[in-house]
């Protein structure tokens, strides 16, 4: 049996976040994650060096562009490549643009669950190795 080939964009929206600047960081507020925090979330580890943006900034972004919601997937795209995180129901955070690829608005919730588990496979990691760029700091774009 031969299966049709489709692009990931036919299943989900592939995007990233809006730019957050250092002067947007605050002492308390909504967690702001970079790639290393996404890796920690993937491992269910504690984030010790937490960054934050204000609730006002977060809700402004949420109203205009959307924020990660349950079932979305973030994949690290700089440094340690290809680590997926499946956003949970109680997650409230934003993330650094360029550090993660954001898969959202799947055609069904099962699509993201399937993709998440596929991203954990050696097959996916082999695909990433074939498209990564950079010598000292690996990246996918």
Name these PLM-found stretches.
Residues 1-22, 27:
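Non-catalytic DNA-recognition/assembly elements of restriction-modification systems
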Residues 19-20, 59-62, 89, 134:
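Short, solvent-exposed loop/turn positions at domain surfaces
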Residues 23-32, 44-53, 65-69, 85-98, ...:
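Short, surface-exposed loop/turn microsegments at beta-strand edges and helix-strand junctions
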Residues 38:
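Hydrophobic pocket-lining residues within nucleotide cofactor-binding pockets
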Residues 71-73:
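Structural motif
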Residues 77, 93-101, 113, 132-141:
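A short glycine-rich beta-alpha junction/loop motif
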Residues 79-83:
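Short, charged beta-turn/beta-strand-edge "cap" motif at the junction between a beta-strand
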Residues 112-130:
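Glycine- and charge-enriched low-complexity intrinsically disordered segments
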């Amino acid at each position: 049996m031969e299966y049709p080939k489709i692009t990931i964009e036919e299943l989900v929206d592939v995007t990233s976040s809006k730019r957050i600047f250092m002067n947007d960081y605050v002492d308390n507020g909504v967690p702001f994650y970079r790639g290393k925090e996404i890796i920690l979330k993937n491992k269910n580890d504690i984030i010790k060096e937490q960054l934050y943006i204000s609730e006002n900034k977060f809700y402004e972004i949420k109203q205009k562009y959307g924020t990660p919601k349950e079932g979305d997937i973030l994949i690290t795209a700089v440094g340690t490549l290809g680590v997926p995180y499946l956003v949970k129901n109680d997650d409230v955070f934003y993330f650094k643009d360029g550090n993660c690829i954001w898969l959202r608005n799947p055609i069904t919730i099962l699509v993201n669950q399937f993709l998440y588990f596929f991203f954990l496979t050696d097959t996916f990691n082999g695909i990433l190795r074939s498209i990564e760029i950079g010598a000292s700091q690996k990246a996918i774009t």
